[in-house]
C-alpha cells in the first residue's frame, strides 16, 4: 500500500463553523472554540425556552427517532443498571431531577440534538423501549423506597394490577426540558455543551459531533472503534469508551493521514471537516477508509512489538514515562500504517527502539512538539516530519509530507 491520499476537492473540507476530547494538550477543549465577531453578534438569534414534557412524551419522541440517542448506544452506556433504576425510582417518587437540554436540529426540523441528559434519556429508553430485540429490558435493581419493584421489568409491571397506579404516575411525571431553537452556528452549541458540563466529569465533544454530523462515515467510525481491541488496548479499556474518545482517536489519526495539508491549527474544525467530507463522499472512499482502519490496527501491533508496554510513551530522564502520549501516536501511526515501511523495519526493531530513545534525549524541539503547544501547526508538522526523518535515516521507504512551516 503506497498512499491513503483521497481524490477529493479540498474545497469540500473548508468549513467556517468550528466545534468540538479530554484536554491533554492534544485534544479539543473549550479554549479552542474560536468565535468570530459576527458569531458573537449572532448569539442573540437563538431562542431558548423551557417546557415540561411528560415521561411518556419523551419516550414517544425517542421511539419516533426524533431524539437521536445513537443506534449503537448499548456499547457506550455509561450508567449501570443500578444507576438507571435509581433514576426511574426518582421519577416514580416525583423527586426533582436535572432538566434535559435539547437543540432543534437546524438541518432537520423536528429532530433534536441532545446537549445534556443523555444518560437519563438512555435510562428511560432501556426501561420503556418497544424494541426488545435491540434493547434488552432494564430489570430494576437497587431501589430503596420502591423496593417492591426490584427485579421487575416494565413489561412485568404492566402485567401486575397492583402496578397500574405507579405506571400511570411514572408515565405522566413531568420532566423539565430546555429547548434551544435557531442556534446561530455550531460553535454556539459547543459552548453550551461545555458550560453545561463545567465542573463535572470531562465529556468528549465527539458525542456532539456524532449528533451534528450523522452519516455513513460517522456511523462506520463508531462501530469500527467500538469493535476495535486495538483502541481498547491503546486507551487501556476493556469496553468501548462511553465518551467516544476511541472514536475521536481513530478519527484524528485518519484525518492526519488523509488531510494533513489542510490542518490550520484548529483541531475541532479539522476533525469536523473530515466527518463532513467523508460522509459526503462515503461511497467513493469507503474502501480506502476501511483499508486505513485495517492498517492502523497493524501499525499498533507493530509499534507494540517494538516498544511493548512503553508504546506511545515519551522517554525522559532515563526511563519511559508511564502516560499515553497522543503526539507520539501521531508520529508513529502516520508511517507505520504503510505496509512497506513495516516490512522494511521488521528486522530493525531494535534500531527503531534506540532511535526513538535518542530522539527524545537529544531533540528538545521534538519533545516540545509532544509536550506543549501540541496543536499548533509547527508542532504538528515537526513531530510528524521529524520522526519520518529518523525512519528515513534507518533506510525505511517513508513518504515524508511536505508541509508549510506556518
What kind of region is each of these model predictions?
Residues 250, 254-406:
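C-terminal subdomains that position terminal phosphate/3'-OH groups for nucleotidyl transfer/ligation
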Amino acid at each position: 500500500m503506497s498512499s491513503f491520499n483521497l481524490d477529493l476537492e479540498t474545497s469540500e473540507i473548508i468549513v467556517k463553523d468550528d466545534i468540538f476530547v479530554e484536554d491533554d494538550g492534544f485534544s479539543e477543549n473549550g479554549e479552542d472554540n474560536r468565535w468570530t465577531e459576527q458569531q458573537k453578534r449572532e448569539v442573540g438569534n437563538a431562542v431558548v425556552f423551557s417546557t415540561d414534557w411528560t415521561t411518556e412524551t419523551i419516550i414517544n419522541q425517542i421511539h419516533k427517532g426524533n431524539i437521536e440517542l445513537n443506534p449503537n448506544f448499548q456499547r457506550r452506556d455509561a450508567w449501570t443498571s443500578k444507576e438507571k433504576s435509581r433514576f426511574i425510582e426518582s421519577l416514580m417518587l416525583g423527586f426533582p431531577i436535572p432538566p434535559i437540554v435539547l437543540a432543534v436540529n437546524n438541518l432537520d426540523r423536528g429532530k433534536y440534538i441532545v446537549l445534556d441528559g443523555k444518560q437519563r434519556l438512555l435510562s428511560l429508553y432501556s426501561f420503556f423501549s418497544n424494541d426488545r430485540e435491540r434493547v434488552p429490558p432494564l430489570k430494576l435493581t437497587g431501589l430503596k423506597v420502591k423496593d417492591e419493584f426490584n427485579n421487575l421489568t416494565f413489561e412485568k409491571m404492566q402485567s401486575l394490577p397492583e402496578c397500574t397506579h405507579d405506571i400511570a404516575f411514572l408515565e405522566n411525571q413531568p420532566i423539565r426540558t430546555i429547548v434551544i431553537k435557531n442556534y446561530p452556528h455550531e460553535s454556539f452549541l459547543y459552548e453550551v455543551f461545555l458550560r453545561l458540563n463545567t465542573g463535572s466529569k470531562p465529556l468528549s465533544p465527539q458525542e456532539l459531533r456524532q449528533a451534528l454530523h450523522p452519516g455513513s462515515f460517522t456511523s462506520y467510525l463508531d462501530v469500527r472503534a467500538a469493535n476495535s481491541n486495538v483502541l481498547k488496548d491503546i486507551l487501556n479499556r476493556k469496553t468501548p469508551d462511553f465518551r467516544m474518545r476511541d472514536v475521536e482517536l481513530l478519527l484524528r489519526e485518519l484525518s492526519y493521514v488523509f488531510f494533513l495539508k489542510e490542518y490550520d491549527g484548529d483541531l475541532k474544525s479539522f476533525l469536523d471537516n473530515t466527518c463532513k467530507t467523508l460522509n459526503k463522499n462515503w461511497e467513493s472512499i469507503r474502501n480506502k477508509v476501511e483499508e486505513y482502519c485495517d492498517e492502523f490496527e497493524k501499525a499498533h501491533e507493530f509499534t507494540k512489538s517494538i516498544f511493548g508496554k512503553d508504546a506511545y510513551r515519551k522517554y525522559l530522564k532515563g526511563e519511559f514515562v508511564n502516560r499515553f502520549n497522543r503526539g507520539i501516536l501521531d508520529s508513529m501511526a502516520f508511517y507505520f500504517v504503510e505496509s512497506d515501511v513495516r516490512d522494511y523495519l521488521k528486522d530493525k526493531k531494535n534500531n527503531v527502539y534506540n532511535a526513538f530513545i535518542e530522539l527524545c534525549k537529544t531533540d528538545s524541539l521534538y519533545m516540545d512538539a509532544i509536550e506543549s503547544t501540541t496543536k499548533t501547526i509547527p508542532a504538528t508538522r515537526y513531530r510528524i516530519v521529524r520522526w519520518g526523518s529518523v525512519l528515513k535515516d534507518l533506510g525505511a521507504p517513508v513518504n515524508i509530507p511536505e508541509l508549510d512551516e506556518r
